Swiss-Prot record:
MF annotations from Gene Ontology: GDP-mannose 4,6-dehydratase activity; NADP+ binding
Residues annotated for NADP(+) binding in this entry: 11-16, 66-67, 88-92, 103, 163, 189, 194
Any one of the GO BP annotations: 'de novo' GDP-L-fucose biosynthetic process
Protein name per its UniProtKB record: GDP-mannose 4,6-dehydratase
Stored NCBIfam families: gmd (TIGR01472)
Protein family per UniProt: Belongs to the NAD(P)-dependent epimerase/dehydratase family. GDP-mannose 4,6-dehydratase subfamily.
EC category name: lyase
Function: Catalyzes the conversion of GDP-D-mannose to GDP-4-dehydro-6-deoxy-D-mannose.
Reaction it catalyzes: GDP-alpha-D-mannose = GDP-4-dehydro-alpha-D-rhamnose + H2O
Keyword Lyase tagged: yes
Cofactor: NADP(+)
Record lineage: Bacteria, Pseudomonadati, Pseudomonadota, Alphaproteobacteria, Hyphomicrobiales
CDD domains given in the database record: GDP_MD_SDR_e
Length: 351
């Protein structure tokens, strides 16, 4: 046990945290995860890998914590003495960041600083490697397409602005203190573990529910927004690969393929056996089930963002050349996988 690498994951109960914890355990690590205290259970994504801490073979441990509490983070880092820290915790919903801009800045921006300071104060600079979950939302009103590590940033939300501070403070601590600290600029990555408030999961869950007669209509905002969507399981491997390099750096992880929300909707419903036909324009546009003529998709202006990000498309050439990382799952296969999982869940047959 003492010869094993030790990893600390903030945001371990999220989509990426769950996949990353599973990967690290498979790689032989001792894994510590930080989770926020909640009045309801929030560990569903990691229940299959959790071990009772009194089990002599246990290698996965949870700690209560919060990115807004510096003394708490300092204590956890001191207790765990990690070889690698993966900072995935964040208020990561773009729309919500417009409603909670101060909290988003506190958790996402200053929270990253708190974690870096814990490493520095505890004298772990030469021991601990740091991964920061950055985001393609940094590019916002993209100045060029596709976007790579040298593309100028233009954040278009409080979330993206907070993540921009986090990005640069990681670069600053890397240069000022010699930390092995890397930014992963990850484009959108989804999975059956994606939260239901994110658009891909909202779409696949609704398509499944509508096909089973459990929901009437799916309401969406900008149908023409385009994103570069990949599979989260493949992206967390890229995170791990960054921390295995001799030198730290910043890397884009992306598929290099862009897909509109509209197309993702069509694929999701197609997996349930339904064909969507579009009628109307603008906020009056609707998606009709071709077989029945019933409206199953509608536009709701409340889901438009105050400042939209219309097109994000990533260039992961550096990650391919330096890390040897590449995506494998197509966005269409990803959509179908998510729908199948949602159908199983709603039918009560998911294992």
């Amino acid at each position: 046990m003492t010869d094993r690498k030790v990893a600390l994951i903030s945001g371990v109960t999220g989509q990426d945290g769950a996949y990353l914890a599973e990967l690290l355990l498979d790689e032989g690590y001792i894994v510590h995860g930080i989770k926020r205290r909640s009045s309801s259970f929030n560990t569903q994504r990691i229940e299959h890998i959790y071990q009772e801490r009194h089990d002599p073979e246990a290698r996965f441990f949870l700690h209560y914590g919060d990115m807004t509490d510096s003394t708490n983070l300092l204590r956890i880092v001191q207790q765990t003495q990690p070889h690698e820290i993966y900072n995935l915790a964040a208020q990561s919903h773009v729309q919500v960041s417009f409603e909670t801009p101060e909290y988003t800045a506190n958790a996402d921006a200053i929270g990253t600083l708190r974690m870096l300071e814990a490493i520095r104060i505890l004298g772990l600079t030469n021991r601990t490697r740091f991964y920061q979950a950055s985001t393609s939302e940094l590019y916002g009103l993209a100045q060029e397409s596709p976007q790579n590590e040298k593309t100028p940033f233009y954040p278009r939300s409080p979330y993206a602005a907070a993540k921009l501070y986090a990005y640069w403070i990681v670069v600053n601590y890397r240069e000022a203190y010699g930390m092995h600290a890397s930014n992963g600029i990850l484009f959108n990555h989804e999975s059956p573990l994606r939260g239901e408030t994110f658009v891909t999961r909202k779409i696949t869950r609704a398509a499944a529910a509508i096909s089973l007669g459990k929901q009437e209509v799916l309401y969406l905002g900008n149908l023409d927004a385009q994103r570069d969507w990949g599979h989260a399981r493949e992206y967390v491997r890229g995170m791990w690969m960054m921390c295995q390099q001799d030198r730290p750096g910043d890397y884009v992880l992306a598929t290099g393929v862009t897909t509109s929300v509209r197309t993702f909707v069509e694929w999701a419903f197609e997996e349930t056996g339904m064909t969507i036909e579009w009628v109307g324009e603008g906020i009056e546009e609707r998606g009709i089930d071709a077989a029945t003529g019933r409206c199953v998709v509608a536009v709701d202006p409340r889901y438009f963002r105050p400042t939209e990000v219309d097109l994000l498309l990533g260039d992961a050439t550096k990650a391919r050349q330096v890390l040897g990382w590449r995506h494998e799952t197509s966005v269409r296969d990803l959509a179908c996988e998510m729908v199948r999982e949602d159908l199983s869940y709603l039918r009560g047959t998911r294992q």
